[in-house]
Design a protein with these regions (language model features):
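Substrate-binding groove of N-acetylhexosamine-processing glycoside hydrolases
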Residues: 23, 36, 155, 166-169, ...
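Short, basic/low-complexity N-terminal boundary segments at the transition from targeting/disordered tails
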Residues: 87-95, 167-172
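C-terminal beta-strand-rich structural cap/linker in extracellular carbohydrate-active enzymes
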Residues: 139, 161-207
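Active-site core of glycosidic bond-cleaving carbohydrate-active enzymes
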Residues: 1-87, 97-100, 123-125
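Surface beta-strand/loop "capping" patches
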Residues: 89-134
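Surface-exposed beta-strand/loop patches in extracellular or lumenal glycoproteins
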Residues: 130-144
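Short, isolated positions in well-ordered beta-strands
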Residues: 112-113, 155-157
Length: 207
């Protein structure tokens, strides 16, 4: 995918259509090339956004919905990655979005992030998590956690096994525990128990 994205830029980002830029932004976010993704979204806003906020295929011509849908999808890719038992916050956050908030993000695993706020200049991230079922998950931050609170109570830090941000290195066992890369600890992750129908609010201070 990375090589394909590089080849796509052979003729320059200026040669890419509106929907192509949205596609590039999504691919870049998943590959954690946050600045390329942000560059693609910025070009959509500068050249492919009509006065009514619809997007177009060519610059200023021919309405096409693709970039509208792809734009919002790319923003979500920058803010959250999820799979069953694993949520990663701000996996591809560009410098241009160093502070912000998002609400009502539906994640895989029957989880909703009812509120997500971040201020990377202050190294602060807060999130409110709502689960549709009793479960235990891993929650990963963009860098090492200095301290954190759950529902206003300060928590003890723990070192969990797992290699970087690769979700493939995290496996949930039948007893509800997790296995990861042997001998490798990740200070950017916590284990979180969630109750069905209950909201859990977390506040993180990052290193």
């Amino acid at each position: 995918c990375l090589r394909a994205a590089e080849l796509r830029l052979t003729d320059g980002i200026e040669a890419i259509t509106g929907w192509g830029l949205a596609h590039l932004a999504n691919i870049s976010a998943r590959l954690k090339d946050s600045e390329l993704g942000f560059k693609a979204l910025s070009r959509i806003m500068a050249k492919f956004l009509l006065p009514n906020l619809f997007t177009c295929h060519n610059e200023g011509e021919l309405f096409q919905m693709d970039a509208n849908l792809g734009f919002s999808a790319a923003i979500l890719e920058m803010l959250v990655f999820s799979q069953s038992g694993y949520i990663e916050l701000l996996p591809a956050l560009p410098q241009g979005l160093s502070k912000g908030a998002a609400y009502g993000i539906l994640c895989r695993g029957r989880i909703t992030l009812t509120e997500l706020q971040w201020d990377m200049d202050r190294k602060s991230v807060s999130v409110t998590v709502l689960s549709d079922t009793d479960q235990q998950i891993r929650l990963k931050l963009p860098c090492a956690i200095k301290s954190y609170e759950i529902d206003g109570e300060r928590q003890e830090k723990e070192q969990l096994p797992g290699k970087g941000s690769c979700p493939e290195s995290v496996a949930q066992l039948k007893d509800g525990s997790y296995s990861g890369a042997s001998g490798c600890c990740d200070a950017s992750q916590i284990r979180l128990k969630l109750k069905k129908g209950g909201e859990t609010r977390l506040l993180f201070v990052l290193d």
